[in-house]
Amino acid sequence: MNKNLLIVYALCGILISTGIAYFFVAYGEYTDWMELLNFGIHDETTEKQVEITLFVTSGLIYFGLALWLIKTRFMKKSPYIAAMIVSLALIITYIASRTVGVPIVGVELYVGKLDVISKILQSVVIALSFAGLYKIQQSVRALRV
């Protein structure tokens, strides 16, 4: 198999896996929210709704990035750049949520398995996107020669 295709297939797989991880996180937040409501705790409703929305949206974005990459036949730079920007933005948001806090949610103290898994997957997305961009640049140079 061509190394270029191996990189993009791996990237698509990681993008889809990251999307699935975010759906699991959203489901976990939803079950936590339902549990709080069952105990009569309504103070965290807005926080949970924002978190669930963020995680579902993030999962959908990762699925969309994988489809965009496939649709452009892996030769456009923009999906790779978008994947890096989205992943980096979510990593920065995560770090901020654990240190200085983010609006509505505040400072989160819990670091779960899915948190770590999603950050590892996002780091791999960034690395594979860089590799994909490098391969595109090499292909362009080869065509010019």
How would you describe each model-predicted region?
Residues 1-145:
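Membrane-interface extramembranous regions
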